[in-house]
């Protein structure tokens, strides 16, 4: 099981509880370490964990599209299409249609990525496509605070 999430939004609450529950059920679960260097790239170990997982839970939250999670997401969707990785989206305080149609904070995030000269335009297009794909998958909508 691979967990993809934006640490600032969910690491210390929803994701931590989910990770603990999965471990208690003896489900081998991989999540990134908050001590990992934050940046525009993800480690080869993280990519390997995605490729070797049978399931991925994607916790889409307000700041998800501002984070390096988009790189994870593109790899997850690629694996979903190629190797039968099962994807389970959780829409955490975001509307699934905003994810699908990239409205709200998703619009803001992509505007920021498109302005960043260090970010490849093809990568941004891949991230948008991956978000659209995941936004069309039936998932769990968490909207109560």
Describe the residue ranges of each PLM region.
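Cross-kingdom TIR/SEFIR domain
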Residues: 20-24, 42-144
